[in-house]
């Protein structure tokens, strides 16, 4: 998610930057930073679905595999000050593999594969997906390079794409417009997994 502070007049000063421009999040941060410097407008990106990133969200390397450097860590800290830690596609705060002594670490765990079901989950990925581990890595990076790219305000959200704040069960309109109330909505395939139909996102 990318949020512009102000009204449409600010947001219309730039074209939306999407994965069709680049799948490298560092390019998004650079584009937002350039927009902010050129216009004086404030903008931020909100990472989410860390639990479905297969170890990519809080990786300690740059997108190209080189070691994380202070420049990019500082840019990320500025562009991503907030994280959506829990939402409709599972919890991204803690995982029982990482916090085996915490009985609450297995809340709404969704850890079979990545978002599109194209890559199965491996235990080695988990430490780079969940907020608790990221906070620890952030403190370590702050000691090593003087900047913490994982210092977040955390929010919980529905991640609904219907623009409706209707998360209560008796008034739940679904995540997408395609699953608004109708008899077969619980069988609606939102994202069809390529590896195994059981990994598809339903509802």
Predicted regions located by residue number:
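Extended, charged catalytic domains and RNA/DNA-binding interfaces, predominantly
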Residues: 1-203
